[in-house]
Curated annotation (Swiss-Prot):
SMART domains (UniProt xref): HOX
Gene it is expressed from: hoxc12a
Protein's name in the database: Homeobox protein Hox-C12a
Residue numbers spanned by region Disordered: 101-129, 148-213
Recorded family membership: Belongs to the Abd-B homeobox family.
Length: 275
């Protein structure tokens, strides 16, 4: 019978379910993810000298690999303050993980990067599948034909050339119509140009009433009335218009023009007498 000593592997081994004779673990000093008594015996490789520092760290470096995880997981995944050694950033390479934080791409980070790339590829494929389904639904609702969608838009140079050629053609058409209207200015009233378009200026479409000159009899009657009275009354104006076959407006305008003519003649006579 062996003595019941704590250092005896035959006594310590069955307690922690480890049957190796050269190694012994104390139950109170098991690392994280260590062997539980109810589980079968699993071999956990020892990782010595995880942190090679010249001083004793205040917190232990938990870097033991767990066999029931896909990748090595440490207890302090955020920042190992006691294990991180300050060194120059020149030899490091970083990559963004999407949340804005930087991670080191050396060492165990390669596995995380591969897993992250795999996850992102799966997400993009799912997103592309949903987007493709949505796009097919949208296109089936608004189906404009494949030819219209596949045709490339014309370049700016071709558009400019087409616009310039159309402008030149339009400029050449009105020139012929202008020559025609210049040749016969009196016949274009109420007509359309030869090119089929409307006239260029709106005054071409206006019909002006032809001036009808007064006859000698009418002028004599109006001059005699003006000599008697420059300012004709309404009653006398109506009588003149009925007798001379003129409108009331024509008699009124003639008397106004005749008064202005008399005024100009008087100013001219005064100017000649002064010089």
């Amino acid at each position: 019978m062996g003595e019941h000593n704590l250092l005896n592997p035959g006594f310590v081994g069955p307690l922690v379910n480890i049957h190796t004779g050269d190694t012994f673990y104390f139950p109170n000093f098991r690392p994280s993810g260590g062997q539980l008594p109810g589980l079968p015996s699993l071999s956990y490789p020892r990782r010595d000298n995880v942190c090679s520092l010249p001083w004793n760290p205040s917190e232990p470096c938990n870097g033991y690999s767990q066999s029931y995880f896909s990748s090595p997981v440490s207890i302090n995944p955020s920042f190992n303050r006691s294990c991180e050694i300050t060194r120059a950033d020149d030899g490091k390479c970083y990559y963004n993980n999407g949340s804005g934080s930087r991670e080191n791409c050396s060492g165990g980070g390669s596995l995380k990067r591969e897993d992250r790339a795999r996850d992102t590829s799966a997400l993009t494929s799912d997103h592309g599948m949903h987007a493709g389904i949505g796009s097919t639904v949208a296109f089936s609702k608004y189906d404009y034909g494949t030819e219209q969608l596949t045709q490339d838009p014309p370049s700016c140079q071709s558009m400019e050339s087409d616009s310039s050629s159309s402008l030149l053609n339009e400029a050449s058409k009105p020139s012929s119509s202008d020559t025609q209207t210049l040749v016969s200015p009196g016949s274009h009233t109420g007509t359309i140009t030869a090119s089929g378009a409307a006239p260029w200026y709106p005054m071409h479409t206006r019909t002006r009433k032809k001036r009808k000159p007064y006859s000698k009899l009418q002028l004599a009657e109006l001059e005699g009335e003006f000599m008697m009275n420059e300012f004709i009354t309404r009653q006398r104006r109506r009588e003149l218009s009925d007798r001379l076959n003129l409108s009331d407006q024509q008699v009124k305008i003639w008397f106004q023009n005749r008064r202005m003519k008399k005024k100009r003649l008087m100013l001219r006579e005064q100017a000649l007498a002064y010089f």
